[in-house]
Amino acid sequence: QRQMCIRDSWWQEGSRECIDYGHKDAFQWITMIRLPDFVKKGDFEWAVKEASAKKKMDFSKVEFFTYEEGICVQCMHTGSYDSEMETIQKMKKYASDQGYEPDYSHRFHHEIYLSDPRRTAVEKLRTVIRNPVRKINDRR
């Protein structure tokens, strides 16, 4: 049985037009796991209660939410997390060539980790990188 992939959304406080990937230490993030569509909020709340009781851990910050990601540019990155900038630059150029620009006004850099870094060689790590975009000159 395949488990759902871990996802992170990253942002930097005060960065509305771009993100400084050279300063990942300033990133803030939320880690997510996509749930199957049949899981409803009541199911989630029951599971959190059960896990809290059985694991004796604090799950108070775990939450159930949905969101619309909007228009994005996305690419598969293979290799070290530290070499993602090269892929991100290619994505930015592709978006620009298509008439789009980055849009971090209310959306985030998003990574979907397809590989387990504990079991996968660094050069074989696979990460989907997704960045929000908007049409150039569409500054809502």
Question: Predicted segment positions?
Answer:
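A mid-sequence, solvent-exposed acidic-amphipathic segment
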Residues: 44-83
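Beta-rich nucleic-acid/ligand-interaction surfaces
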Residues: 105-125
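Short glycine/proline-enriched loop/turn "hinge" motifs that connect secondary-structure elements
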Residues: 22-24, 63-68, 123
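A short, hydrophobic, proline-anchored segment that marks a local hinge/packing element in signaling
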Residues: 33, 128-135
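Extracellular-facing segments of soluble proteins and assemblies that are Gly/Ser/Thr-biased and enriched
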Residues: 9-16, 22-39
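Long, well-ordered alpha-helical scaffolding segments within enzyme catalytic domains
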Residues: 48-53, 83-103
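Short, small-residue-biased leader/transition segments that mark boundaries at the very start
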Residues: 2-6
